[in-house]
């Protein structure tokens, strides 16, 4: 009974947040949700890493963050295949009431939102990396916007977004911890460099 009540609340929240905002908002959130839209942002982040720390750290950031994003995507796919749950656009009792944009309905299942997981993983990792308040606010604002776009388009329930967000934050934190350990191993501390030079 409790579980069914939670599912009903999830559906009610979805329908409340999925209202038709008109052609302008439809286009806006459709573009926001498209993965290719944010390629320039990812390129800008990598450029900022290179500008501040150089090629070596850029390579490690790209590798660790790439593994983090890949893990988020695969874990979400695992849940979609092994604990399948219909997307709102494919749920028989509410699909007729779900607002969709340009006929986009997504695949059948959407247990955990990969968009939310990936965006929040990137947000946490890069916020910890740059440690700038303005950047932290901006990148988490971007992640929230991207996550909400999935509800607006009707392809994820709020619960899917929350699960994806939790997964992304966990993976982002783990990836940054791994990155920190790697940097301690591969980068020689300045003090050690000075000692080596003075010994010659």
Q: What are the language-model segments listed below?
A:
Residues 1-41, 76-107, 200:
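N-terminal transmembrane-helix/juxtamembrane module of multi-pass inner/ER membrane proteins
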Residues 24-25, 54-60, 89, 131-137:
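Membrane-helix interface segments
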Residues 40-49, 66-67, 170-174:
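Hydrophobic core of alpha-helical transmembrane segments in multi-pass integral membrane proteins
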Residues 41-52, 119-127:
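Hydrophobic, aromatic-rich transmembrane alpha-helices
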Residues 45, 71-75, 79, 171-179:
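Alpha-helical membrane-inserting segments
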Residues 46-75, 136:
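Interfacial segments of alpha-helical transmembrane regions
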Residues 58, 66, 70-86, 162, ...:
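Membrane helix-loop-helix hairpins that form the core translocation module of multi-pass transporters
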Residues 99-200:
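Membrane-embedded catalytic cores of phosphoryl/pyrophosphoryl-handling enzymes
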